[in-house]
């Protein structure tokens, strides 16, 4: 995503080592063109070891911006599309959180941030599946925080949105 690439560039400018993990070949190509160090998500369970191979250690920080573009009226979605959405937008994230959480637990240190959306609370027509996936992500990260905060791992969710601050009105 544009946000993910901007975040990776900003962190890199601050001296952080970053790795953009992408689900698709298109995402890998965009990150590569932007000069970012990138890796295919593939099987999430192998991500900590693949990071160890690249950086000498598993990830200590995770910013999760993963989401699909699946938007449909709830009653209008094809059953196959719903199953794919659940597997990718919920199941794949759960596997990622589990794998990275376990590797952080072994080190007794980790910081995780899930980037959600205001659609989680207030979806517009056609955003039911997107909103549901964001709510599921928030629940996973909230549960990770509850379960592992006493062991050095913190997790939180951020709901991004536009704010009407009342400025600039004519």
What kind of feature is each model-predicted range?
Residues 1-17:
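Canonical Rossmann dinucleotide-binding motif of NAD(H)/NADP(H)-dependent dehydrogenases/reductases
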Residues 16-28:
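Conserved glycine-rich Rossmann-like NAD(P)H-binding loop of the short-chain dehydrogenase/reductase
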Residues 32-45:
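Rossmann-fold cofactor-recognition segment
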Residues 42, 61-86, 126-129:
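Conserved mid-core segment of classical short-chain dehydrogenase/reductases
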Residues 56, 75-97, 113, 137:
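Catalytic Tyr-X3-Lys loop
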Residues 63-67, 111-117, 154-159:
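Structural signature of the Rossmann-like NAD(P)-dependent dehydrogenase/reductase core
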Residues 88-109, 145-146:
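Amphipathic alpha-helical dimer-interface segment in Rossmann-like NAD(P)H-dependent oxidoreductases
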Residues 111-136, 141-142, 146-149, 162-164:
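Catalytic loop of short-chain dehydrogenase/reductase
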């Amino acid at each position: 995503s544009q946000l993910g690439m901007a975040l990776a560039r900003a962190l890199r400018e601050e001296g952080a080592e970053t790795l953009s993990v992408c689900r698709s070949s298109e995402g890998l190509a965009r990150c590569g063109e932007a000069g970012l160090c990138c890796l295919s998500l593939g099987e999430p369970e192998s991500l900590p070891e693949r990071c160890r191979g690249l950086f000498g250690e598993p990830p200590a920080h995770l910013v999760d911006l993963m989401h699909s573009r699946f938007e449909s009226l709830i009653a209008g979605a094809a059953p196959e599309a719903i199953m794919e959405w659940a597997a990718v937008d919920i199941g794949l994230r759960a596997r990622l959180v589990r794998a990275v959480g376990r590797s952080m637990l072994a080190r007794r240190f980790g910081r995780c941030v899930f980037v959600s959306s205001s659609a989680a609370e207030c979806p517009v027509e056609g955003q039911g599946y997107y909103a549901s996936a964001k709510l599921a992500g928030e629940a996973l990260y909230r549960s990770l925080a509850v379960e592992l905060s006493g062991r050095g791992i913190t997790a939180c969710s951020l709901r991004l949105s536009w704010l009407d601050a009342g400025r600039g009105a004519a």
